[in-house]
């Protein structure tokens, strides 16, 4: 995928704020501080498009980014941060459920987990939730530069077993720091567009 343009459309807290242009959407979900904002910036080739916060749990909105004026990448609010109140957790849950259950132009929800660590109970709950709505064929393993390539398979096995992934589901290791794995992720997203006969322009990307 050649990213020619990418911009934030809106940071939404309610369905009435969601874009109404009907463009296909690919959403990213993950724990606070798993590296979602860094991943968004890297795949969209914009260093500061998504704000990278030093304080986990800051993302309280659903952020819609338009890519090449053809589709949206959607950054869902992070979860699993201990210092948020019960009320905030309930608000997060309602926001996520509303988006996942009602968005007709949503074609995939990709879960991000930290490749170094065993997925948490919250990760498992999120993955089951994503699967319930018919998504979850791709999991991104972030911060892949933090372990050796020789350890990948061991960590993939750990992630698959903890999440209960199907054999056909993919794990894509990504390093935002070294910009590794981006082409593979875009290729998998392109496959989703093609499988659904979506009119997305697919061009070979320049090196990330």
From Swiss-Prot:
GO cellular component: cytosol
GO biological process, one term: division septum assembly
Classification via InterPro entries: G_ENGB_dom, GTP-bd, GTP-bd_ribosome_bio_YsxC, P-loop_NTPase, Small_GTP-bd
Single GO MF annotation: metal ion binding
Record keyword Metal-binding present: yes
Domain of life: Bacteria
Residues given in the record as GTP binding sites: 30-37, 57-61, 75-78, 142-145, 174-176
Gene3D superfamilies for this protein: P-loop containing nucleotide triphosphate hydrolases
UniProt entry tagged with the keyword Membrane: no
Record keywords, A-Z: Cell cycle, Cell division, GTP-binding, Magnesium, Metal-binding, Nucleotide-binding, Septation
PROSITE patterns: G_ENGB
The protein's required cofactors: Mg(2+)
Family to which the UniProt record says this protein belongs: Belongs to the TRAFAC class TrmE-Era-EngA-EngB-Septin-like GTPase superfamily. EngB GTPase family.
Alphabetical list of PANTHER family matching this protein: ENGB-TYPE G DOMAIN-CONTAINING PROTEIN, MSS1/TRME-RELATED GTP-BINDING PROTEIN
Function: Necessary for normal cell division and for the maintenance of normal septation.
Name of the protein in question: Probable GTP-binding protein EngB
């Amino acid at each position: 995928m050649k990213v020619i343009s990418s911009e934030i459309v809106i940071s939404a807290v309610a369905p009435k704020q969601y874009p109404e242009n009907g463009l296909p959407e690919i959403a990213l979900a993950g724990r606070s501080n798993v590296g979602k904002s860094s991943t968004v910036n890297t795949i969209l080739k914009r260093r500061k498009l998504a704000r990278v916060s030093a304080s986990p749990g800051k993302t309280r909105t659903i952020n819609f980014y338009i890519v090449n004026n053809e589709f949206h990448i959607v950054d869902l609010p992070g979860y699993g941060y201990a210092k948020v109140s019960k009320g905030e957790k309930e608000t997060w849950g309602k926001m996520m459920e509303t988006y996942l259950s009602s968005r007709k132009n949503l074609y995939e929800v990709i879960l991000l987990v930290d490749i170094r660590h065993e997925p948490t109970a919250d990760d498992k709950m999120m993955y089951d939730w994503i699967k319930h709505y018919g998504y979850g064929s791709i999991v991104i393993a972030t911060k892949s530069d933090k372990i050796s390539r020789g350890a990948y398979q061991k960590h993939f096995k750990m992630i698959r077993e903890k999440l209960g992934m199907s054999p056909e589901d993919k794990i894509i290791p990504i390093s935002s720091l070294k910009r590794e794995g981006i082409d593979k992720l875009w290729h998998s997203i392109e496959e989703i567009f093609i499988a659904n006969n979506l009119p997305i322009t697919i061009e070979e990307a320049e090196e990330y």
